[in-house]
Structures are given as structure tokens and as C-alpha cells.
UniProtKB/Swiss-Prot annotation:
This is Coenzyme A biosynthesis protein 3. Keywords: Coenzyme A biosynthesis, Cytoplasm, Phosphoprotein. Component of the phosphopantothenoylcysteine decarboxylase (PPCDC) complex, a heterotrimer composed of CAB3, HAL3 and VHS3. Residues 146-171 have a biased composition (Low complexity). Residues 43-59 have a biased composition (Basic and acidic residues). Present with 2940 molecules/cell in log phase SD medium. One of its GO terms (biological process) is coenzyme A biosynthetic process. Belongs to the HFCD (homooligomeric flavin containing Cys decarboxylase) superfamily. Component of the phosphopantothenoylcysteine decarboxylase (PPCDC) involved in the coenzyme A synthesis. The modification Phosphoserine is found at S42, S116, S121, S124, S264.
Length: 571
């Protein structure tokens, strides 16, 4: 009875072994089945571990299990079924074979022990060292645990903190920018109010001065109302009382704007406060529309040898053009009209800013229309042997060329070689032996434009005789504060004065060298004359000596003859 039961158990185990072989992968791995004694020992160990505390027991049992099954990569049969092994074998395509030893261990007598399928058994898989992975797919270390979750939580917290810090920094930067903008706006408003107060004060002073001048001159300007019935009556308007006479506050102030005319009430010539006759400044006149040349054109270019320094000034379309009369007046104060001569070239936009300003009568103003008038003079004047071209004559006449202010439009024209007006034509025809000074003046955003930098760089590189007087940072006419305003006119005058002194010094050295050469040449000529005189003197002396010798010989002969005669008489 026992033998039949053992045989049936063996047959059953054999069938299970065959099914296991057919279902497992074909990798040849030695497999051994643990005995019941070993299994009971492991179960006993696990039961001992379960008696400890829940957390400590769990960690220790996990570590024990890892120590038991990690070295030989073993697993418990109760953790998986043969059906799972079969599914895994179908998925595995490596072609390995697994051999399972299902024979029962033998006793010392040679009899096999009975195998009980009800008891849990373990299968050990032994993998070669080459095919071992760093971590088995059933290893506990690969499974996500609390430590990994804590790390992810820490990373999320760090990211949130960084985002909060970045937001705080952005808010602080915005607040600083807003404060800076407010400060700049306050400064601009303060300067505008100061400027307005200064202008009002100057207007008040100008009106008071005008009233004093009108009372001293005995001018009596009255107002007449226009009657509706008479059409031939004319109105005389007292312009100072009706309009404000604005004044520009500058050092050496002598510039006044023409009062604004009322469209409905024209101003008579008597009421004009800026006429040449009523002006308190001598040798100055108001700039008006061109009325043709005051003197023939040739008068300005036949004086190249007048022993004066010739300064040519160009003004372009910038509001800084109103400072040109200040520059001219200061140069005349330094040198005087006897030592320098100044001529001014203005463009069409520059005329708009110069209109109504007072200019010295020693200055000749050239406009764009004068070039065509110059051609008419060439046609009418038959005495000229050659046709004179205005921009050629200006280039020959000038010893230095100052363009102040230089607008962005004219700067672009000069950089690209455009010559569509008198000023640009003179510059295109300029000689590299004569220095040129340019003072740019424009809005801040026009000055920081990349094209402005490109134009200035090309001018300096292509024309080494050009010196750029860089603009300064100031409150512009539009109210903005920034770089782009023309250099201070006093600085421009000082730079021009230095260049004039340098040119004069170089000329004096050249003239000194020429005079020294002439003196040396004259000395050499004098030495030659002295040598010739010495030779003539020597010849004269020789002739005198010869004559003296002949005379002495003749006297001696006469004395001898007289002696002989005396001897004969005695005998």
C-alpha cells in the first residue's frame, strides 16, 4: 500500500516536472529543489522575525530574504505559479533551456524520501557571471519606494522655491525701474519749470528794455481802431504790447526773435522793434530773406592775400543753429575783423532757425540760391576771363571749415557723397590739406541709431582731415534728457582758436624757413661779391706795385745820370 502511494507520488511529481520543463525557458541552468528540512528552517527563521516590531521586523525580514535569495537569485514558488512561468517562457525568445531535477534526495539506505506537493517548495536559478544583470528584475531595490518619493518631493519643493525667488526678483526690478522713471520725470519737470521761469524773466526784461528805448528815441506809436464805414483806413499796431518779444537765454546774449505778426492786423515798418535803425547793437543787422548780393561776388574772392585768416562756417537744419551768431561774435571779439574774415553757408532748413536773428555785418551769408545767381554773374560779366564756380571759390578761399551744427540729414549726405546743395558741394570739393571740424546735433534716438555710428565712422576713416566734436548729454529742446545735443558753443570757439593758432604757427615756421633760405642765399651771393672785390683789389695792388717799381727805377736812372754829369763837370 505504501509502495503504491510512493509510486503514485513519484508519477505525479514526474508529470509536474515534465510540464515544468516544457513551460520554462530553454536556458541550461542547474536547478535544485530544497528539502523539507531546509524549507522548514527558513520558515522558522521567518516566524522568529515576525515576532519583533512591525517596522523593524519588516526591514529585517526584507534584508534576510535578500540575503537568502540574492546570492543565487532564488525565488519562492509561492510567489509565482507554473502558469506564469509558462507565459514568461512564451515571451522569452533567447532559446535557453532550463533543466529541473525532480528526483527526491536519497537516504543513507539508498531509498528516496517521499515528496509532499502540499508543502511549499523553492526553485533556485543559478545564472552565470557573464549573463548576470546588476539588479534582478525581481529585486526589491528596483521597486519605487518611499526614499524615491521623498526625493521627488524635495525636488518639487526646490523648484517652487526657485520660482518664488525669481518672481520676487522680477518684482523688485520692476519696482526699481518704476522708481527710476519717476525720478527722471520729476527732474524733467523741475528743469522745464526752471526754464519757463527763466524765459518769463527774460521776456519781462526785454519788454522793459524795449520800452526804455522807444521812449528815448521819441517814437510815438499809437493804436487806431478800424471803422466799419471807411475802407481806405490802415491800422498801426503796437507789436510789443500785443505780442510777447521772446528772447533766448545764452551767454553774450544779443539774439532776439522777431515778434509774431497778427494775421488780421499787419505790422507797419515803424512798429518793427528789430529794424537795423532801431537796433542798439552796432555792426549787426537782422537776417531776412535774400535780396541779392550787396556787393559783386568777385569782391569776396579777390582778397585771398589780405593777410587775414579765412574761416568758413556751415549751418544745417538743427535748432542749435541759433548759436551760430554767438560763435561768430566770440571769434570777432578774440581776433577782430582786422585779423579774420568769416563767411557763412546756410541750408534751407537752417534759414528757418536764423530768420530774425542779428548777425554781424562783417559776415557774408551764402544761400543755396546764390550758386545760380553766381552763374548769372558769369554770363553778364564779360570782363571775367574764366567762369567762376561758387563752391570752388569757397574752397580756395577758406583756411578752415566749421560745420556747426551738423544735422543727421547732412551727416548722411556727407557719408554717402551726396552733393545736392551748396554746403555738400563744397564738402565734396574740399581739399585734404585744409582742416574740417563737424559738430553733430540731433535727438537722442537719432544719435544712438546704428546708421549714425556707421556714418561718423566712415567719415573719420575716409577723410582723415575731419575732426568730430562729439555731442554732449543735456536737456534737449523737446524736453528729453540724453546724448545728442551739440557741443557747447564756447568749447567750439576754443577748439577753433587752437586750430587757428596751430595753422598760423605752421605757416610762420614755413615763412621763417623761407626767409632763412633767402637770407642764406643772400649771404652766399654777398660772399661771392666779396671774393670778386678781393680779387679786383689784389689786381689793383699789383698794378700799383708795378707802377711804383717802374717809377722808382726811372728815378734811380735819372739820379745816376745826374751823378755822371756832376763827375764830368768836376773833371
Amino acid at each position: 500500500m505504501t509502495d503504491e502511494k510512493v509510486n503514485s507520488d513519484q508519477n505525479m511529481n514526474g508529470k509536474q516536472g515534465v510540464n515544468l520543463i516544457s513551460s520554462l525557458p530553454t536556458t541550461q541552468v542547474p536547478v535544485s529543489i530544497l528539502t523539507n528540512k531546509e524549507r522548514r528552517k527558513s520558515i522558522h527563521d521567518e516566524s522568529n522575525f515576525e515576532r519583533s516590531d512591525s517596522h523593524e521586523d519588516q526591514s529585517k525580514s526584507n534584508s534576510n530574504r535578500r540575503n537568502i535569495y540574492k546570492n543565487d537569485y532564488s525565488t519562492n514558488l509561492r510567489d509565482f505559479s507554473f502558469a506564469n512561468l509558462k507565459q514568461n517562457s512564451e515571451r522569452n525568445k533567447d532559446g535557453h533551456e532550463i533543466q529541473i531535477n525532480t528526483s527526491m534526495p536519497a537516504n543513507t539506505n539508498g531509498q528516496q524520501k517521499r515528496f509532499s506537493p502540499s508543502l511549499p517548495s523553492a526553485v533556485s536559478f543559478t545564472v552565470p557571471e557573464v549573463e548576470r544583470l546588476p539588479y534582478h528584475r525581481y529585486s526589491i531595490s528596483n521597486k519605487p519606494g518611499k526614499q524615491q518619493q521623498q526625493q521627488e518631493q524635495l525636488q518639487q519643493n526646490q523648484q517652487q522655491e526657485e520660482q518664488q525667488k525669481a518672481q520676487l526678483q522680477e518684482q523688485n526690478q520692476r519696482a526699481k525701474q518704476q522708481e527710476e522713471v519717476k525720478q527722471i520725470q520729476e527732474q524733467v519737470q523741475k528743469k522745464q519749470t526752471e526754464r519757463q521761469q527763466l524765459i518769463d524773466e527774460k521776456e519781462r526784461i526785454a519788454n522793459a528794455i524795449f520800452k526804455e528805448n522807444t521812449t528815448n528815441d521819441g517814437t510815438d506809436i499809437r493804436k487806431h481802431s478800424v471803422s466799419s464805414g471807411t475802407s481806405n483806413s490802415e491800422d498801426e499796431v503796437d507789436s510789443p504790447s500785443m505780442e510777447k518779444n521772446s528772447i533766448v537765454h545764452m551767454p553774450g546774449d544779443f539774439i532776439y526773435f522777431n515778434p509774431k505778426s497778427n494775421a488780421s492786423k499787419p505790422i507797419t515798418a515803424k512798429a518793427a522793434p528789430l529794424s537795423a535803425n532801431n537796433s542798439t547793437h552796432k555792426n549787426k543787422e537782422v537776417i531776412t530773406a535774400p535780396t541779392g548780393p550787396r556787393v559783386p561776388f568777385t569782391e569776396f574772392f579777390q582778397k585771398e592775400d589780405d593777410k587775414k585768416f579765412h574761416i568758413l562756417i556751415g549751418a544745417t537744419g538743427s535748432v542749435a543753429t541759433i548759436k551760430v551768431p554767438l560763435i561768430i561774435d566770440k571769434l570777432f571779439k578774440i581776433y577782430g575783423p582786422e585779423k579774420i574774415s568769416i563767411q557763412l553757408i546756410v541750408t534751407k532748413p537752417a534759414e528757418h532757425f536764423l530768420k530774425g536773428l542779428k548777425m554781424s555785418t562783417h559776415v557774408k551769408i551764402w544761400r543755396e540760391e546764390d550758386a545760380w545767381v553766381f552763374d548769372a554773374v558769369n554770363k553778364n560779366d564779360t570782363s571775367l576771363s574764366l567762369n567762376l564756380i561758387l563752391h570752388h571759390e569757397l574752397r580756395k578761399w577758406a583756411d578752415i571749415f566749421l560745420i556747426a551744427p551738423l544735422s543727421a540729414n547732412t551727416l548722411a549726405k556727407l557719408a554717402n557723397g551726396i552733393c545736392n546743395n551748396l554746403l555738400t558741394s563744397v564738402m565734396r570739393d574740399w581739399s585734404p590739406l585744409t582742416p574740417v571740424l563737424i559738430a553733430p546735433a540731433m535727438n537722442t534716438f537719432m544719435y544712438i541709431n546704428p546708421m549714425t555710428k556707421k556714418h561718423l565712422t566712415s567719415l573719420v576713416q575716409d577723410y582723415p582731415f575731419i575732426q568730430v566734436l562729439k555731442p554732449v548729454e543735456k536737456v534737449l529742446i523737446c524736453g528729453d534728457i540724453g546724448m545728442g545735443g551739440m557741443r557747447e558753443w564756447t568749447d567750439i570757439v576754443e577748439i577753433v582758436r587752437r586750430r587757428i593758432n596751430e595753422i598760423r604757427k605752421a605757416r610762420d615756421e614755413e615763412t621763417g624757413d623761407k626767409e632763412q633760405e633767402q637770407e642764406e642765399q643772400e649771404g652766399a651771393d654777398n660772399e661771392d661779391d666779396d671774393d670778386e672785390d678781393d680779387e679786383e683789389d689784389e689786381e689793383d695792388e699789383e698794378e700799383e706795385e708795378a707802377l711804383n717799381e717802374t717809377a722808382s727805377d726811372e728815378s734811380n736812372d735819372e739820379e745816376d745820370e745826374e751823378d755822371e754829369e756832376d763827375v764830368k763837370t768836376e773833371v
